[in-house]
């Protein structure tokens, strides 16, 4: 087996600000990652890519909440929004990589929607710290807080306020054996996003 390199892509590097939230903007952002991965593959590494999803999962969750409030559609739990963003972001990265890998014909990228096992008593459930979604002004935050008293917000890097959710310490990646098998078969794996 070749040397394994794990490349971590921040969700905030895919959506840099509120003006860059579209799928088109995100697809452009991951193209640079694909170019870097192609260079690494030329150096004969096996590669696993993982990615954050803070802005994306917050948008998906808020979209589901608005659809519930306005249209009575069922709420989507946060865990399902995480899986949705793993698939969506993974698809964008996979597509960008496969487009660049196609002329070389050897490797293919594949996305694995990944679950992690956590401790149900993890303090992260009591004290959420993971910023998600868009940035809000102080007034917007106050309005959202009044409408949703159980939500928590933090000021994030001088750019505004963001909602925070639990981010417990992962204990085990459930799909680790499948990821390992895919690497051994020569795939570039995109997994453990979130």
Residues covered by each model-derived region:
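Short, active-site-adjacent cap segments at secondary-structure transitions
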Residues: 13-15, 54-58, 117-121
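Aromatic-enriched hydrophobic runs in primary sequence
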Residues: 21-24, 85, 194
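Glycine-centered flexibility motif
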Residues: 11, 87-90, 194
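Ligand-binding beta-strand-loop-alpha-helix segment within the catalytic cores
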Residues: 67-189
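Short beta-strand segments
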Residues: 8-10, 50-51, 110-115, 191-193
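N-terminal glycine-/serine-/threonine-rich phosphate-binding loop
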Residues: 1-50, 59-66, 77, 181-186
């Amino acid at each position: 087996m070749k040397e394994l390199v794990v490349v971590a892509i921040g969700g905030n590097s895919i959506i840099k600000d509120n003006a860059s939230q579209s799928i088109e903007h995100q697809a452009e952002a991951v193209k640079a990652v694909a170019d870097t991965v192609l260079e690494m593959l030329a150096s004969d590494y096996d590669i696993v890519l993982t990615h954050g999803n803070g802005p994306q999962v917050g948008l998906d969750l808020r979209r589901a909440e608005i659809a519930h409030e306005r249209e009575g559609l069922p709420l989507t739990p946060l865990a399902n929004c995480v899986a949705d963003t793993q698939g969506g972001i993974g698809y964008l990265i996979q597509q960008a990589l496969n487009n660049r890998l196609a002329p070389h014909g050897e490797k293919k990228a594949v996305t694995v929607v990944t679950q992690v096992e956590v401790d149900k008593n993890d303090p992260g459930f009591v004290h959420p710290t993971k910023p998600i979604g868009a940035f809000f002004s102080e007034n917007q935050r106050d309005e959202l807080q009044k409408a949703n008293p159980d939500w928590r917000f933090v000021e994030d890097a001088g750019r505004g306020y963001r909602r925070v959710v639990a981010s417990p310490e992962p204990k085990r990646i459930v799909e680790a054996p499948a990821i390992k098998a895919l690497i051994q078969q020569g795939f570039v794996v995109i997994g453990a996003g979130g």
